[in-house]
Amino acid sequence: MSAGGDFGNPLRKFKLVFLGEQSVGKTSLITRFMYDSFDNTYQATIGIDFLSKTMYLEDRTVRLQLWDTAGQERFRSLIPSYIRDSTVAVVVYDITNLNSFQQTSKWIDDVRTERGSDVIIMLVGNKTDLADKRQITIEEGEQRAKELSVMFIETSAKTGYNVKQLFRRVASALPGMENVQEKSKEGMIDIKLDKPQEPPASEGGCSC
């Protein structure tokens, strides 16, 4: 396996598991990050899907292993084994679906049952493009994250809003990144994804 430019150093791998209720946008967030695309036709994830992405950070290269889990009840028994050796849990809810938000506490409890405090947890409120149907305010999301001592961000997989920032913030919190965070207090790490450079012109939607 290639070290992707980190000659003499094995490429560090970090496992990110995406959790949340059905149709909150877990697969769409991964697809936006991996391919910068969005598919309007919804297809439920069956069981567990796995994708891998190399990220070139300021001072090193890491490989993110993205595990996309099914939200349906019938697949719940599979999920703990995937949480068990994860570095990061990304718990996603739909800002237009109150139940999906309420269930985030249960998902985070599941993560802590399997991993204790030895895990980074990011709470993500997805579908900000549907602001007119919003049921959970950003303040409520921030408050929930504060109560549960986890990170928080809102995103739109459809427009791409904050998706890169989500992964930047996760990357800045990875084990061994403390020295980079010191140099980069705002977590604004220069991340080059392993795909051709995008033209500097329009990027479609907000590129925050």
Curated annotation (Swiss-Prot):
This protein's record includes keyword Ribonucleoprotein: no
Residues modified as O-AMP-tyrosine: Y82
InterPro entries (alphabetical): P-loop_NTPase (IPR027417), Rab (IPR050227), Small_GTP-bd (IPR005225), Small_GTPase (IPR001806)
Activity regulation (record text): Regulated by guanine nucleotide exchange factors (GEFs) which promote the exchange of bound GDP for free GTP, GTPase activating proteins (GAPs) which increase the GTP hydrolysis activity, and GDP dissociation inhibitors which inhibit the dissociation of the nucleotide from the GTPase.
Required cofactor names: Mg(2+)
NCBIfam families in the record: small_GTP
Protein name, per record: Ras-related protein Rab-6B
The organism of origin for this protein: Homo sapiens (Human)
